[in-house]
Structures are given as structure tokens and as C-alpha cells.
């Protein structure tokens, strides 16, 4: 039935003279999402509105599902449109529309006309009144309620006449790419994909780095992270995923540093490597999935020790959330089932039985001096041998690299 969509946005609408930049970015993200759908679509931006018209047959549910992944969209209005062939023809179209959607239900409605074409022979109030009367005559179970109707029937008089009565909630946020770029430390767990999703919602384009530790972590663990990146890319757009072989660095830390400090020291070197790649790729910050107090390495003292090695800001979108809240989002974005697959990542091996929760930074730095003779070479090797893949959802939803 529906041949078109009106795209509503919220935050973009309060922008000033640069609003067109945000609108253009939103159009590009809509195009990216619709490439995953069967059918051809045209997108028009006119007078503060974005319209999507189907040029061929398409799967309605598939289109809605993909549009719901586009940050910046606050609402999706499925529409029909007709050529302006006179008011009598419009009345018949309106009656058919109401019958098809609502049948003989006892419901209240109001008509909300909008004339972008001021030369239309009826004014807004006349359109509202005449169409309301036609609906009442054709559907006697309907009643008018101008204050709190169950149905708001919108009729827009433009070059064509657009009709819609439903607004499907979008994800909100800002279009990806309008908020700069940052580097996500992506593990195989639940939290970091959620962090990537949440920062993308604020318009930030993400790259990602994954620390692989063969043979202690398997190729299945690596593939799991690629799959998580693919799932996040439905929302974020294509992700450059940098895969670092971290094994030799981990072994050196294990051999030369106190075991209760393994996790903190390991994470400090992860942050150093991630920041190096971030600077090379013009990222403006790092992103992690940490939440205060969730594990020993995420106490305030531990986070301060981790931050100390960075000059770039570290963004932690999950910082004030409990695990249940993070899990709920991971379920909503379909990363949860992949995250809980039982493949270990490098953060789960060489774990101390009693990790320090209040690390002393001076002590940590003193113990890191045990690595001075090897660590620079190990880090250089890890960076020089990194593997970079581009992960995206293609038209079939598969991973492409």
C-alpha cells in the first residue's frame, strides 16, 4: 500500500545555518541503509523535509527495519501519494486509505492539512472540514476529536498530495559522521559493541582496534569480533577494524611484572597502541566499554591509571550504566547472542586470581620499567604487522571485507 516515507528529525531541526550539512549527512546514511533492501528508492530533501519514494516494488518491513538503524531519524511516516487530479478524487483516495488501515473500528480522528502549494483552491481549514465530513459519511463508526485523537490524518499538498497517519519511532541521535571520528577498543564482550553503538548515536564515526593473542585466542574469537563489528556497522556505517597481534606483549608483561597488576599494565599498553593508530587515522579520541566498578580494572583508581598513558580523550558511553542496562541495549541491537559465544579474548587470559583494584600509579610505572629493554620493539612489531579489514553490511546483510 505504502509507496513513500516522510523522514522526521528532531535535533537537526534546531541547527542554524549549517543545518543543511546535517541533513545531507542524514540523506547519505539513509542511502547506506536502503542499499541493504530490495528495490530502488529516490530520496528528496525539500524545505526542511526528507522524502523517500519507492521507484520499484519493495519489502515494506525490510525498509522500515533498515531505516530504524539510521541515527538522526526521530520518526518514519509511511505515506501514500497521489497526483492532484481534483478534490473529488482526493476524497475518494482518503476514504480508501482510512478503510484499508482502520476498517470499521470505533476510533477518533482529526484531519491535519498542510498547503505547501498556496495556489490550491481550498485553504487549510476548508480541506480539514471537507475531508473530515467525507470520512464521517463513509465511516460512521469514526468520530472527530480535535484535541486528543487516536488517528492524526496528515494531508500535505505539494507537487503531489501526500497522505499519512502513523509515525514509527526512529533511533534519534545525530547522523553518523557529523560528530568527528574516534577509535573503539572492540573486544568480544558485551560492553564494547554497545559503547560503539552509543557513541555512533551522537554522530561519531568509529574505527576499531581488536587485540588478538594467538594461539591463546582462536581464529573463532577473531571471527566473533569481526561479526560484532558487522552488527555494529548496521548503525555506524563501515568500520575499519585494525587487528593487533598482542601475544608477545602479553607474555612479556606476564614474565616481568607482578601478576596482580597484569590487567592494568596490559590495558595501559593497549591504550598506547590504540592511541597510536588513532593519531595515524585522524581520530579525535578513544572509546571503551568500561563501566565504573564492574570489574577490578574498572574501578575509579584503575581507570585513572589507564587514562594516564593517553593524551587523547577517552570516551566511555557505558560508564554510569549497570550490566542489566548494557545487556538490554546489546539485545536491542542484536549483538548479545554473538557477544556471549564462548571464545576467549586476550583480556580473559593470564588473569590474576586477585587483581589490584586500587593501583598505585608510581608503583605501576616502576614495574613497567622491567619491560624497558623489550617493550618498544614489541610495540613496533605489533603496529607494523597489524591487519586492517573494512567491515560493513552489504545488500544481503553479510560481512564484506
Stretches with model-predicted labels:
Residues 1-183, 193-239, 308, 356-361, ...:
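RNA-binding accessory domains that recognize and position tRNA/RNA substrates
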Residues 133-135, 172-179, 250-251, 255-328, ...:
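Active-site adenylate/phosphate-handling loop in enzymes that bind or generate adenylated species
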Residues 184, 208-210, 243, 288, ...:
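Structural beta-sheet core signal
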Residues 189:
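Conserved G/P- and acidic residue-centered "switch" motifs that form tight phosphate/ATP-binding loops
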Residues 229-255, 343-345:
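A conserved beta-strand->alpha-helix junction
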Residues 292-294, 342-350:
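Small/polar glycine-rich anion-binding or flexible loop at a beta-alpha turn
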Residues 334-342:
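A short alpha-helix-loop-beta-strand transition element characteristic
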Amino acid at each position: 500500500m505504502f509507496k513513500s516515507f516522510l523522514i522526521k528529525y528532531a535535533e537537526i531541526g534546531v541547527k542554524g545555518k549549517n543545518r543543511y550539512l546535517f541533513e545531507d549527512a542524514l540523506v547519505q546514511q539513509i542511502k547506506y541503509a536502503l542499499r541493504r533492501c530490495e528495490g530502488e528508492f529516490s530520496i528528496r530533501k525539500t524545505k526542511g523535509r526528507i522524502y523517500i519514494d519507492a521507484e520499484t516494488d519493495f519489502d515494506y518491513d525490510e525498509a522500515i527495519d533498515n531505516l530504524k538503524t539510521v541515527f538522526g531519524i526521530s520518526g518514519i511516516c509511511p505515506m501514500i501519494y497521489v497526483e492532484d487530479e481534483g478534490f473529488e478524487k482526493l476524497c475518494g483516495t482518503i476514504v480508501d486509505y482510512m478503510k484499508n488501515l482502520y476498517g470499521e473500528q470505533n476510533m477518533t480522528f482529526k484531519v491535519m492539512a498542510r498547503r505547501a502549494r498556496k495556489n490550491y483552491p481550498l485553504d487549510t481549514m476548508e480541506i480539514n472540514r471537507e475531508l473530515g465530513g467525507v470520512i464521517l459519511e463513509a465511516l460512521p463508526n469514526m468520530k472527530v476529536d480535535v484535541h486528543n485523537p487516536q488517528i492524526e490524518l496528515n494531508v500535505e499538498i505539494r507537487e503531489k498530495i501526500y497522505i499519512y497517519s502513523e509515525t514509527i519511532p526512529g533511533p534519534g541521535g545525530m547522523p553518523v559522521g557529523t560528530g568527528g571520528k574516534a577509535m573503539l577498543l572492540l573486544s568480544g564482550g558485551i560492553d564494547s559493541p554497545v559503547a560503539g553503538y552509543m557513541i555512533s548515536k551522537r554522530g561519531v564515526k568509529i574505527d576499531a582496534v581488536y587485540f588478538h593473542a594467538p594461539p591463546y585466542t582462536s581464529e573463532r574469537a577473531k571471527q566473533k569480533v569481526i561479526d560484532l563489528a558487522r552488527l555494529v556497522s548496521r548503525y555506524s556505517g563501515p568500520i575499519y577494524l585494525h587487528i593487533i597481534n598482542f601475544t608477545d606483549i602479553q607474555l612479556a608483561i606476564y614474565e616481568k611484572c607482578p601478576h596482580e597488576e597484569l590487567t592494568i599494565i596490559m590495558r595501559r599498553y593497549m591504550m598506547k597502541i590504540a592511541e597510536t593508530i588513532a593519531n595515524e587515522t585522524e581520530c579525535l579520541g578513544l572509546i571503551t566499554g568500561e563501566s565504573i566498578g564492574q570489574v577490578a580494572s574498572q574501578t575509579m583508581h584503575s581507570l585513572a591509571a589507564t587514562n594516564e598513558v593517553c593524551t587523547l580523550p577517552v570516551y566511555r558511553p557505558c560508564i554510569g550504566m549497570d550490566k542489566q542496562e548494557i545487556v538490554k541495549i546489546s539485545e536491542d541491537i542484536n549483538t548479545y547472542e554473538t557477544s556471549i559465544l564462548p571464545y576467549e579474548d586476550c583480556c580473559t587470559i593470564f588473569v590474576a586470581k586477585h587483581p589490584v583494584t586500587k593501583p598505585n600509579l608510581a608503583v605501576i610505572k616502576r614495574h613497567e620499567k622491567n619491560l624497558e629493554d623489550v617493550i618498544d620493539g614489541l610495540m613496533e612489531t605489533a603496529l607494523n604487522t597489524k591487519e586492517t579489514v573494512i567491515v560493513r553490511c552489504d545488500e544481503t546483510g553479510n560481512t564484506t571485507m
